[in-house]
Structure formats: structure tokens, C-alpha cells
């Protein structure tokens, strides 16, 4: 099995807001993410794990559409996506209504859940933030459902 893992991409951030280079830096972050997707297309990992803060704030509908278009370029890779403490799910979040490509598994809840992948004999556990901060140690009580499988 091969997987890629990224976190804290912070798409949509405006580094050094007000400076002449701010917009270019913001675009550089999007370009870097698109380049990472191209690497995934070349390397064909089984999984792309995105463990929070793909966005710097609540994603706009057009931003999610752009990301979905990028994910659709790697249909051979299962994308597992969690919302983090910057892009946490709110009542009006477009995360809740996004129509993800078939290869995307989004963790919609703030309680640990899992996705099973029989072809890879793998189970992936995760959760999304629904608040800026989670104070409980939610993973402390999580134990693999099946120890004969690969559990991530």
C-alpha cells in the first residue's frame, strides 16, 4: 500500500495581507496544492490523507468546486478529508452540501468514524472539527475494529 499525507495547507490564506506580494503568495499556495495533486497522479498512491485545515477558513463554494476538480484528476486514489480547527464545519458550511467526487471520503462528524477499504485490507479512522477547539482526547477510546487489517 502507498499513501500520501498532507495537513495544514491553508488554501485561501492571505499571507502578509496588505503587502505587495500577498496575492502572489496566496496563489502560490493554491499552485503548490495543485502540484501535489499532479504528483499524486504520477505516483498513484492508494490513499491521500488530508488531516485538517485544507482551507484557512470556511471554504467558499467556488473553492470547494475547484478542489473537487483537482481531486477528480486522481480517480485511482481514495482521498480522505477531515476539516480542521481553521476550516471546521459550521451549520452553514459548504462542506455539508458539497458533492464530492466518487474517490473522496469526507469525515462529516466530530466523533471518530471510519471508512473501510477491502481491496487494500485497510480501515481509516478520523473525524472533523465542528468547533475551533476540541477539548476531549477523542482518539484515546478508539480501538481498531479488526486487528487483522491495516488500521490508520
Give the location of each predicted region:
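N-terminal active-site segment of His-dependent metallophosphoesterases
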Residues: 1-66
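His/Asp/Glu-rich metal-coordinating catalytic cores
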Residues: 47, 57-152
